């Protein structure tokens, strides 16, 4: 029964409702849409409707600017950014790229990570103002401080460290993919005499094996050149997932008649678009490549004339000691950089032109007809050719002999070799996976040998590794300080020492197993590292300096590196002030002492150069930096100003730096950084780079900031000119103009007679050991960390829309068969572990994986894992001694080119339900 109160309440509600309806009917401004009005002109006479106008205004903008996205991505894509009330609201691809004749256009460029950037930039993990740690490192307890407080503390610590400990104890790792942003740290490193690590080796992305063959190793065609190929090998490359802006060129090439081949341990998404899938066992790719070379040579599927001119395969090698026959063998004052070939016309050994020591800087042979094959004698010295040595050492690697190692049936190898032999334009898309295996060094040499044997290198084909970047003289000048070279080191070696990774690897790997497979163990790797440093082959700064002050710019150092927790703890005990500059609180920032807020991509004024397209792209700064953020250039300018101010106040001027024949001028470091006021602002810095680069020049700044992109001129190519009417392809001038390569022999060099290469049996490209994963066999799974679809490294890994397109948390992937054997179901939380560490993740069934493989897509942050673990907490690494070699012509320490690569895909693990 209803109570009186309930009855009265209902009656009052009805009364008020009736009154409200009556009032609305009487008011001309309320419920106007319900009135019946005569409409004579349907286009003009409809009443104005306020509620509809809300939607109209939602799609109006105060301004539209241009930008690209750079953090870890090599693509280069132009976007419009729509701004309202000073806030970037959304972005849209710019589809105005010009089309080359006969080539599909690049419109539009972009991916889903770029499309959500404006949304992601507003999330709470993006930094608004300077922060200082108030708890223990890693506790994530902060207080807000002013820029002046932050810069003063950093400046004083830099000065104190340099004065008390000596120059070279400042460490500045960086890897932001934008010209001015990156160069800001480079310039500061030079002025402080600081240590700068090779960030490419830190991530395991060097192509050191290929660097022994050509210089530079890291080169690509512009990706529209894929369309011109008729055979494309995607070797541990998954462009459908990782090259979203460019994958259409593969599909268009296929429609144009090209064959696509996917070579991978897993049946990845690119495999379904392939004409042939080659399932190679993890860590055995060099054996597969050797089998292909074996078939090509045995069937004489090679271009002899090309090999005679473009390669060192006809060069003579002594049979007594395995060394090149050199001019110094016959003359007391002869060069050790001048070599011989056997001239079949003259019937004798003659000097080959084009080498480093040759006066004739050309590959033109003139009347010389070098012998590719044969055994000869000259002046009492028995010699043979490099090609003969190669044939002899590659003979055992037949498709039948390698099947047990690679898991690839001989018929598949022969089918693929046949396609290679008959194709007109071979393209090898060389992914980042192989280089992270011990097998990767020799495999790189073998891959480029395949391309070279059929005469496609620098002609109709290419082996595309990673982008080389365009030649911008202005950028080089901005990053150079006369008389102040700074200190460059291998990131792997720096972390091997400071992070005590040597001990971690020694504890993890089975020494007896390594000695059986490789002939040496971790102790020998360490002794060879020390020997290399003592010989001056590799820089030794990590052995004589400490990272007392670390300023990390745009790189997630611990999460990026092997042995996360081991590196972190040992590095931080050496580091007294850890500064992180980034636009968000990533895993590395958790352990910072001071965090400086860098500008978002929408807040930058900068340019992006990447040679996968013929364009420079703009960060057009659609909005000014919000809150208290600053661009990286402005942060370094402000730091330089504060150092100079504090030095003058403390009466400190110059500190000599005799180790690098330089000095640090603290009292004028701001003047030096800004070139006495020429490059104070971001715009001044960008204009300086563009105006002083031949491939761009005056006027291009306005063009790139208006359109979002600008085409580079012919001189931008580092290995040849950029044509106006067709895609760029590297190393063409070596074929067309007979220009020597930057190698010791001046040619594509497939023989290295360095003592260490001889000792390790690696003079020619061939497998370095029996193949397979080198991790302890007591753990049944090999762990790989492929690039992800829903993030670019850690970029966008926390973005809400990207998380909704996947499991929303870190996962590991296993084959259903392996899961069943472990009693694990899809969606279970599992523990992945070995002697080095553990991490937890949700398991996801992936039938495309081999039963012994475990995938953990990289880029996840530590704080996204259960118990604050991380996938790199189980990894350990090895050093390939071949990558420690130096003092041999072109084979020497080169940042971004040649130094020890991160080899950590030899890690094995086990899995159990958590």
Swiss-Prot record:
GO MF annotations, alphabetized: 4 iron, 4 sulfur cluster binding; chlorate reductase activity; metal ion binding; molybdopterin cofactor binding
Residue ranges annotated for the 4Fe-4S Mo/W bis-MGD-type domain, each copy included: 62-125
Binding, [4Fe-4S] cluster: 69, 73, 77, 111
Biotechnology: Has potential use in bioremediation of waste sites contaminated with chlorate, such as pulp and paper industry wastewater.
Signal peptide: 1-32
Subcellular location: Periplasm
Annotated cofactor note: Binds 1 [4Fe-4S] cluster.
CDD domains reported in the protein's UniProt record: MopB_CT_Nitrate-R-NarG-like (cd02776), MopB_Nitrate-R-NarG-like (cd02750)
Enzyme nomenclature, EC number: 1.97.1.1
Post-translational events: Predicted to be exported by the Tat system. The position of the signal peptide cleavage has not been experimentally proven.
Assembly information from the UniProt record: Heterotrimer of alpha, beta and gamma subunits.
Function as written in the Swiss-Prot or TrEMBL entry: Terminal reductase that allows anaerobic growth on chlorate as the sole respiratory oxidant.
Name of this protein: Chlorate reductase subunit alpha
């Amino acid at each position: 029964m209803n109570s009186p109160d309930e009855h009265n309440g209902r009656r009052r509600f009805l009364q008020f409702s009736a009154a409200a309806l009556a009032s609305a009917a009487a008011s001309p401004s309320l419920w106007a849409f319900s009135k019946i009005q005569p409409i004579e002109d349907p286009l003009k006479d409809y009443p104005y409707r306020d509620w509809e106008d809300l939607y109209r205004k939602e799609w109006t903008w105060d301004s539209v600017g241009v930008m690209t996205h750079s953090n870890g991505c090599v693509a280069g894509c132009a976007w419009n950014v729509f701004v309202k009330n000073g806030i970037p609201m959304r972005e849209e691809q710019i589809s105005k790229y010009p089309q080359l004749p006969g080539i599909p256009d690049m419109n539009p460029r972009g991916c889903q990570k770029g499309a959500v950037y404006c949304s992601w930039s507003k999330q709470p993990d993006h930094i608004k103002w300077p922060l200082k740690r108030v708890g223990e490192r890693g506790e994530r307890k902060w207080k807000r401080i002013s820029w002046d407080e932050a810069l003063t503390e950093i400046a004083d610590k830099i000065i104190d460290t340099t004065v008390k400990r000596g120059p070279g104890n400042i460490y500045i790792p960086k890897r932001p993919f934008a010209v001015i942003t990156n160069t800001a740290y480079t310039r500061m490193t030079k002025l402080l005499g600081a240590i700068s690590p090779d960030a490419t080796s830190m991530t395991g992305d060097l192509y050191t094996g290929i660097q022994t063959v050509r210089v530079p190793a890291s080169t690509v065609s512009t990706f529209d050149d894929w369309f011109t190929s008729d055979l494309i090998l995607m070797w541990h490359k998954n462009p459908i997932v990782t090259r979203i802006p460019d994958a259409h060129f593969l599909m268009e090439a296929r429609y144009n008649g090209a064959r696509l081949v996917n070579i991978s341990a897993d049946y990845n998404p690119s495999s379904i678009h392939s004409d042939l899938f080659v399932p190679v066992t993890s860590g055995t790719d060099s054996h597969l490549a050797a089998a292909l070379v074996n078939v090509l040579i045995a069937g004489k599927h090679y271009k002899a004339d090309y090999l005679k001119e473009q390669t060192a395969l006809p060069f003579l090698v002594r049979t007594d000691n395995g060394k090149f026959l050199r001019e110094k063998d016959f003359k007391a004052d002869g060069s050790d950089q001048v070599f011989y070939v056997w001239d079949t016309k003259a019937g004798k050994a003659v000097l080959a032109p084009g080498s480093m020591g040759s006066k004739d800087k050309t590959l033109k042979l003139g009347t010389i007809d070098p012998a590719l094959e044969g055994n000869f004698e000259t002046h009492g010295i028995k010699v043979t050719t490099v090609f003969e040595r190669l044939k002899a050492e590659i003979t055992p690697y037949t498709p039948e002999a390698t099947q047990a190692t690679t898991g690839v049936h001989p018929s598949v190898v022969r089918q693929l070799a046949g396609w290679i032999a008959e194709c007109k334009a071979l393209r090898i898309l060389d992914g980042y996976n192989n280089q992270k295996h011990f097998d990767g060094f020799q495999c790189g040499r073998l891959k480029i040998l395949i391309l070279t044997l059929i005469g496609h290198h620098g002609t109709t084909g290419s082996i595309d590794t990673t982008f080389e970047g365009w030649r911008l003289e202005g950028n080089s000048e901005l990053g150079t300080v006369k008389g102040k070279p700074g200190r460059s080191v291998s990131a792997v070696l720096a972390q091997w020492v400071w992070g005590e990774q040597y001990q971690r690897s020694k504890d993890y790997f089975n020494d007896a197993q390594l000695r059986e497979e490789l002939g040496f163990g971790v102790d020998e790797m360490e002794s060879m590292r020390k020997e290399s440093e003592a010989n001056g082959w590799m820089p030794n700064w990590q052995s004589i300096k400490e990272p007392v002050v670390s300023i990390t710019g745009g790189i997630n150092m611990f999460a990026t590196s092997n042995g996360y927790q081991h590196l972190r703890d040992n590095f931080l005990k050496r580091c007294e002030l850890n500064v992180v500059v980034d636009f968000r609180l990533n895993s590395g920032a958790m352990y910072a002492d001071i965090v400086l807020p860098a500008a978002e991509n929408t807040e930058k004024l900068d340019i992006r150069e990447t040679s996968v397209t013929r364009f420079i792209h703009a960060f057009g700064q659609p909005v000014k930096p919000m809150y208290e953020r600053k661009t990286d250039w402005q942060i370094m300018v402000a730091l330089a100003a504060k150092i100079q101010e504090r030095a003058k106040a403390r009466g400190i001027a110059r500190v000599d730096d005799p180790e690098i024949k330089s000095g640090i001028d603290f009292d004028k470091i701001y003047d030096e950084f800004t070139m006495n006021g020429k490059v104070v602002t971001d715009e001044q810095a960008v204009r300086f780079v563009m105006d002083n680069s031949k491939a761009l020049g005056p006027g291009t700044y306005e063009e790139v900031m208006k359109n979002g992109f600008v085409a580079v001129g012919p001189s931008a190519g580092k290995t040849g000119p950029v044509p106006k009417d067709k895609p760029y392809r590297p190393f063409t001038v070596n074929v067309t103009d007979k220009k020597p390569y930057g190698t010791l022999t001046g040619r594509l060099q497939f023989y290295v007679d360095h003592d260490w290469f001889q000792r390790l049996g690696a003079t020619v490209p061939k497998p370095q050991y029996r193949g397979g994963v080198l991790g302890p066999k007591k753990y049944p799974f090999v762990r790989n960390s492929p690039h992800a679809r829903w993030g670019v490294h850690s970029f966008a890994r926390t973005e809400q829309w990207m998380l909704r397109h996947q499991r929303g948390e870190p996962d590991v992937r296993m084959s259903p068969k392996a899961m069943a054997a472990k009693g694990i179901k899809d969606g279970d939380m599992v523990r992945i572990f070995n002697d080095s560490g553990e991490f937890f993740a949700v398991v996801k069934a992936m039938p495309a994986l081999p039963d012994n493989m475990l995938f953990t897509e990289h880029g996840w942050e530590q704080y996204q894992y259960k118990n604050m673990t991380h996938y790199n907490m189980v990894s350990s690494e090895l050093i390939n001694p071949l990558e420690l070699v130096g003092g041999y012509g072109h084979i020497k320490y080169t940042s971004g080119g040649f130094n020890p690569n991160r080899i950590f895909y030899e890690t094995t693990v086990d899995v159990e339900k958590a």
